[in-house]
Swiss-Prot record:
GO MF annotation terms: metal ion binding; metalloaminopeptidase activity
Cofactor note: Binds 2 manganese ions per subunit.
Keywords: Aminopeptidase, Hydrolase, Manganese, Metal-binding, Metalloprotease, Protease
Cited function: Catalyzes the removal of a penultimate prolyl residue from the N-termini of peptides.
Gene Ontology biological-process annotations: proteolysis
Cofactor: Mn(2+)
Chain residues that bind Mn(2+) 1: 420, 518, 532
Identification of the protein by name: Probable Xaa-Pro aminopeptidase P
Name of encoding gene: AMPP
Entry EC number(s): 3.4.11.9
Listed CDD domains: APP
GO CC terms in record: cytoplasm
Cited Gene3D superfamilies: Creatinase/methionine aminopeptidase superfamily, Creatinase/prolidase N-terminal domain
Residues where Mn(2+) 2 binds: 409, 420, 532
Length: 612
């Protein structure tokens, strides 16, 4: 990972800050739609800081610069940030949040500015209150993005890729039904309508997909839904005649993407039940710019999105697709690991991290309904595996060492579902420490996968099940244990998750959710271990039903064996061995027929799924 010299960029930015009488400038990671993963044209924080991770916030003053990020990226950020930057390791004791650091730098009535399109309205409100309380300072919405000015002509163009229709056979619910369900919620809230700004929510609601953001099948758009109208704000160059006709048949009007702010201003308040003013609903993740355009607190009600909640609970067609695509994805993974071992060990061929990742992509491309990858493949050998979101660079990454840990975190987009899986393997003789760490992580994975819990339980409450065996050894990991996953949509999907963050205590898991289970352990400079499966949350039968509550459990859908070479069988319980054997039998039975004419892969699969 090479450092970028940001001195010139920061100097130009500070000149602009002085010209606008700004003392502190905040550069978030997100785009205008609060997207975690963004198009190249929206990578402003990366451009100004040199840090390429998916999460973080840059704060620049007239003489300092700080980059805040979470535990997934401490290692990466320390390697990528140059001498101009202070790294704020969020979540560590005595390290201020970027909001607190901004407030400290603004003390004394200074001006803090941010592009209002790039920060959620709720986040802007909290930041404004914090800096005002700290030193009487003011948060200013600066609509001219100063990083864009510094970037200039080198800034990439905004993608204008075509929009495609997702067949109801895959979505499981037509647009008419989804709009009806949303309008029922609008009636319950006695609201004028809802502005939909999250890209995956627009795509899900209208059964459309795109490719404007790498690995995420979404397209730049907004939607405004009222009780009797539906408007899609999108560049018309994206819409082919079939898409236009599809939208027309479903009563959806199209307008240019750039018209959203002017149009929402026309959504005026009217009297509702009991004579109160009707408000327009806005997701709690929507931008400050949208809220300002709608008229502020008096005319807007921020809510947890009904669409996000509905999207997270997959219907039976989506769940069937998830099961099916994971079997096909598992076939590609099994073929990959068998091939990789043969290349590295039997044939002693030298392969680097990118060459291996390319082979895995090639194998996935052969599978039915394949569209593309769901994120950059993390193909990492040895110490690189300790970089949680490592990205190998073509032409400069190391060769895979068969005598070291190899971690591969990968996934794909299929028309019938989205996959995300991590397997950690060792083709040689692992150390006792590596085997212990791997087995502790495996035990945590099994513990969470086996959990049964009452309806209403949150991912926050379940998180410790995955960490318990590491904790007993004084070990842990600095990332969440699980995230929601879309159905041929974003690989990271809210509002659910499993982890220690506050938001995971706010939304309980529900039958139909798809979530990852991915404990890990990372020894900086040495090795990293992560084991990740996707699982469907399902109602389970229990002998009793205390409080008349249904009970839930997990149905794992990932079909890839664990690394037997890294398992210390002596510390597995009988129940854990039984779970592992049942899991391996399931994998073998669902994938073996694909290898009838592939003796090498079938032999590898048979060996790796033998009972222990």
């Amino acid at each position: 990972m090479e450092k970028v010299d940001t001195s010139g960029r920061l100097s130009k930015l500070r000149e602009l800050m002085r010209a606008h009488s700004i003392d502190v400038y905040v550069v978030p990671s997100e785009d205008s739609h609060s997207s975690e993963y963004i198009a190249a044209c929206d990578a402003r924080r990366e451009f100004i800081s040199g840090f390429s991770g998916s999460a973080g916030c840059a704060v620049i003053t007239l003489d300092k610069a700080a980059l805040a990020t979470d535990g997934r990226y401490f290692n990466q950020a320390s390697k990528q940030l140059d001498h101009n930057w202070l790294l704020l390791k969020q979540g560590l004791q005595d390290v201020p949040t970027w909001q607190d650091w901004s407030a400290e730098q603004s003390a004394g009535g200074k001006i803090v500015a941010v592009d209002p399109e790039l920060i959620a309205a709720a986040a802007a409100k909290k930041l404004a209150a914090k800096i005002h309380k700290f030193g009487g300072s003011e948060l200013v919405a600066l609509e001219r993005n100063l990083v864009d000015v510094v970037w200039g002509k080198d800034r990439p163009d905004r993608p204008r890729n075509p929009v495609v229709i997702l067949d109801t056979a895959f979505s499981g619910k037509n647009v008419e039904t989804k709009l009806r369900d949303l309008r029922q919620e609008l009636v319950k809230k006695d609201s004028l309508g809802m502005v939909v700004s999250m890209l995956d929510e627009v795509a899900w609601l209208l059964n459309l997909r795109g490719s404007d953001i790498p690995y995420n099948p979404v397209f730049f758009s907004y939607a405004v839904i009222t009780l009797d109208t539906a408007t899609l704000f999108v560049d018309d160059t994206k819409l082919h005649p079939d898409s236009l006709e599809y939208l027309r048949k479903n009563g959806i009007v199209t307008k240019p993407y750039s018209c959203i702010f002017d149009d929402v201003k026309a959504l005026t308040s009217s009297k509702g039940v009991q004579g109160r003013e009707k408000r327009t609903l806005l997701s709690s993740k929507a931008s400050w710019a949208l809220k300002r355009a709608l008229g502020g607190d008096d005319l807007v009600e921020e809510v947890r999105s009904f669409i996000g909640d509905a999207k997270a609970v997959k219907n039976e067609a989506e769940l069937a697709g998830m099961r099916a695509c994971h079997i096909r994805d598992g076939i590609a993974l099994i073929e990959y690991f068998a091939w990789l071992e043969d290349q590295l060990v039997a044939k002693r061929i030298v392969l680097d991290e990118v060459e291996a990742a390319d082979k895995l992509e090639e194998l996935r491309q052969k599978q039915e309904n394949y569209v593309g990858l769901s994120f950059d493949t993390i193909s990492s050998t040895g110490a690189n595996a300790a970089v949680i979101h490592y990205k190998p660079e073509r032409g400069s990454c190391p060769a895979i060492d068969p005598e070291a840990i190899y971690l591969c975190d990968s996934g794909a987009q299929y028309l019938d579902g989205t996959t995300d899986v991590t397997r950690t393997v060792h083709f040689g003789c692992p150390t006792a420490a590596e085997k212990l760490a791997y087995t502790l992580v495996l035990k945590g994975n099994i513990a969470l996968d086996s959990a049964i819990f009452p309806k209403g339980t949150t991912g926050f409450a379940l998180d410790c099940l995955a960490r318990q065996h590491l904790w007993r050894e004084g070990l842990d990991y600095r990332h969440g244990t699980g995230h929601g996953v879309g159905s041929y949509l974003n690989v990271h999907e809210g509002p659910i998750g499993i982890g220690t963050r506050v938001q995971f205590a706010e939304v309980s898991l529900a039958s139909g959710n798809v979530v990852s289970i991915e404990p890990g352990f990372y020894e900086d400079g040495a090795f990293g271990i992560r084991i990740e499966n996707l699982a469907i949350v399902r109602e389970v039968q229990t002998q009793h039903s205390f409080g008349d509550k249904p009970y839930l459990g997990f149905e794992h859908v990932t079909m890839a064996p664990y690394c037997k070479n890294l398992i210390d069988i002596s510390i597995l319980t009988t129940a854990e061995k039984e779970w592992l054997n049942a899991h391996n039998t399931d994998i073998f039975n669902k994938t073996k027929d694909a290898f009838k004419d592939d003796a090498l892969t079938l032999a590898w699969l048979t060996r790796e799924t033998q009972p222990i």
